[in-house]
Amino acid sequence: MPNRRGSRNAYYFFVQEKIPELRRRGLPVARVADAIPYCSADWALLREEEKEKYSEMAREWKAAQGKDAGPWEKQKPVSTPLRRPAMLVPKQNVSPPDMSCLSLKSDQALLGGIFYFLNIFSHGELPPHCEQRFLPCEIGCVKYSLQEGIMADFHSFINPGEIPRGFRFHCQAASDSSHKIPISHFESGHDQATVLQNLYRFIRPNSGKWPPIYCKSDDRARVNWCLKYMAKSSEITQDLELVTVEDLVVGIYQQKFLKEPSKTWVRSLLDVAMWDYSSNTRCKWHEENDILFCALAVCRKIAYCISNSLATLLGIQLTEAHVPLQDYETSNSVTPKMVVLDAGRYQKLRVESSGFSHFSSSNQEQRSNTPTGDYPSGVKISGQSSSVRGRGITRLLESISNSSSNIHKFSTCESSLSPYMSQKDGYKSFSSLS
């Protein structure tokens, strides 16, 4: 009997691709076998055409090993832990976005189309045998168009509810390794029903059917689960159509430019770090605490990347609503050879000068950012001014620029004193000049 221990199928390559993400969450994943229990739910949410990518990888591997892959057949995951039927995550019936409804033959219709980018953060991911897989703690949503850029955004912290017994340390460790949102006694957290209703009010169309909501493919399983979980505690439920933003970008290129980019290229387009410390990207709480992971920042960076990619192709004039242009101007003024950051000192100074904690300042943000119209709590219109600036490298570059101007003034002053300098002694004291 041939040895089949070395056989690799589509699920093997899917798990192998998910390992870096699992490690970022703080999960103890050293090899593929360790990651298998954490990937079964995400695998179940994939469509058949998405699984075909990993099936092709398996066939290529078998061909390289001198094996005959044979006719294509559906690959089944190996070593997938069994769960009760009630605990299975329902398979999401999501089809690729229907780009024909946007009438992409008309440039004006494409530029004026409205898109919503959504992301929900959780206090880690519980094992597959748990009925509650995620604990939602933060939500961010952005209203975007290619013509106007970011038109409005919605952000709110979520009260995750009771932590499942025995998983408090697991959830705390996952939070500390990413968004660092406290798992309990967080004053800025709102109940799940209120947050979901405010989200519905933010994306509710004036007429017609509800628009599709876009998120990254790596986050779709978590976002979809959290939406359904939060809907259980809300009186008003709406079955939102959740589509991957990768499909949106592929659809735009395919319909408008008659070419279809690969999903790998699109993912590399969206997963960039150049916007991580840009101004007005993160929420105020994450900005003040100098924390990189933020649900609102994920949505905003999607808009930045799409604007940056399609601006020249569609003739879009970039504005502050498309990308943070002021950071470009600042970063191009000075190019230091070495950068030393002391974020702790600046953090201490900001706390002492403000006179209140980060939690109370976040509450003030919630109140100050709430418009007086029909917009729900957490909604901010792009036209409103904001005092939040980028931390770290942006402020350092500005200080270096100011220091350069001061050095120039000093050199001018030194030149004016040159007649008083003695060639023999090299200098004279100012007292001797009198």
From Swiss-Prot:
It is found in: Cytoplasm; Nucleus. It holds the Pfam family HMG_box_2. One of its GO terms (cellular component) is nucleus. Residues 357-387 are annotated as: Disordered. Residues 363-372 have a biased composition (Polar residues). Gene3D superfamilies: High mobility group box domain. Interacts with SMARCB1, SIN3B and DDX4. Interacts with piRNA-associated proteins TDRD1, PIWIL1 and PIWIL2. Interacts with TEX19. Belongs to the maelstrom family. Plays a central role during spermatogenesis by repressing transposable elements and preventing their mobilization, which is essential for the germline integrity. Acts via the piRNA metabolic process, which mediates the repression of transposable elements during meiosis by forming complexes composed of piRNAs and Piwi proteins and governs the methylation and subsequent repression of transposons. Its association with piP-bodies suggests a participation in the secondary piRNAs metabolic process. Required for the localization of germ-cell factors to the meiotic nuage. This is Protein maelstrom homolog. It comes from Sus scrofa. The lineage of its organism: Eukaryota, Metazoa, Chordata, Craniata, Vertebrata.
